[in-house]
Each structure stands twice: as C-alpha cells, then as structure tokens.
Amino acid sequence: MGPTWAVVCGVVASDGFGWRGEDWIRLALLVLLVDGGWGTLWSSLGGVNWAKPLRRWRHWRFGAPFATPPYTLPNSPGDRISRWLGQLGAWWRDVFWPACGPAFSAIVIAFAVTVVLAVLLGTELLLLSAATLAVMQLGLAWEGGRGTVAPHWDALVAVMMPWLAGHVAFGALGLRSLGLALAYAISWGAAWRVDSPWERALGIGSQFLAAALFVVLRSPLAAGGLLLLLVPQVALFPWLRRGQSAAWYARHARPWLMAAMLIAAWAARSL
C-alpha cells in the first residue's frame, strides 16, 4: 500500500495528470513498475540472507573440475579455471540455490520487468530505476546482506523513490516535491523505531518541517492541516509506555501519515 500511495502523492504533486486515457495507462504502468518491479526486487534482495552462502564460498574447495581442453598442463591457467568452475558449480548447486534460488529467480524476473517498464515510461524513469537499484544495494550492504533491512532504507525505497517516480512521470521534478518526499520517507521509517526517543523526535520533526515549508510558502491552511494530523500521531505515544510495540504504533499512525502525505502533495501542486 505504501509505494502505491506514494506514487499517487507524487502524481498529485506534479499537477500533470490530465485524466485522459493515456494518462491512466501511464499511471497503471507506473504502479506496475513500482510495485511489481521495484517492490519485488526489494523484497527479494532484503528478505534473504545472502551473506551466509557467500561466506561458505570463501572456503569452498569441493566439486569435480570441468572438462579441460586437451593438453592442458597441471596448474596451468586452463587447469585452474577448470577447477574453479567445478567448485563454483558445486557451490551453486549445493549451497547457493537451496538457500537463495527462489529469491534469485524473482530478482531476475523483476529486473527484466523493471527494465521493460522503465523503457516504456521514458528516460527519466529509467534513470530513476537505476538510482533506486543503487539505494537498494546501499541498504543491503548497510545490513551486511543478512536478510534484514533497516526501516529508513525501506522507507527510501517504499516512499521517497515512488513519490519521485509519480512526479517525474507527469511533470518536471522540483526541490519542493523532493523535500516533501524525503521528509515523509524519514517519518515513515522512524515510525518503526518509535521506541527510541531520537527516532520519535526525527519522525515528528520531519513532518513539522514539512508544515513549516508551507508556512514559508504562505500556505497557512496546508500547514495547519499537516500540524493537525500530527496530533493523533503524538497522542499514540503514551501507549508505547504501556507495552505496545513500534509495529503497533506504525500500524495505527500510518493512516494519519498517509493523509498528511496527500495533503502536502495537493498543497504543493497549487504553489
């Protein structure tokens, strides 16, 4: 739900959706790109422990050599390549594929879908897809490829990049929309670590800065609406001291955060 909602917010912020048939087709392709392409890539990359089979490969010495060309001398480059390929094949069959095979297959298919849809949608979406893949790789490396993803990296992929995709698909991207996408991505990620006082302040502070932006842009009604939507999110904090988890908070605060995202996008389009 999050990526699709962020796409809608980006489209609204662009003020370029014309309600014509071709616009609806473009929006449908965009949702397929973000959910079917990026989403599948991200869930497959972040949901599997890639580090474990790679650690085993460092010390892997099993597997019969591949067939070598005639007259290949022992310990020659051809012989070493043959032994290395044999070890790689055995490691792939016995270690990598049982642990990571389904995810690897999903990544290959999702990558092909991403490339095709991005090409259909234009150069901007192709470049943004490449940037999204780079963010995914950074998030994966940050956690060491152990099958877990930090909430803020997840928010960048699930909120910020889809928002930017929605905007770029229907209009020229500006700093205003970029700033809003980043602010709400930060808040989205912080909600999953709200048991930390620092993350709590970060999540509320980023939304407060979004409201302050509209004060600077002389849109007090939008600023007031965003501040009003902060109230129920802050009102949930006492329940954390009563034993509720960060996941509980994120689930109950999300509707208010999503409403704030849409109001901010709508207000940005008219400025």
Q: What is each of the regions a protein language model found here?
A:
Residues 1-141, 154-196, 201-271:
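Hydrophobic alpha-helical transmembrane segments
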Residues 151:
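Short acidic/histidine-rich active-site segments
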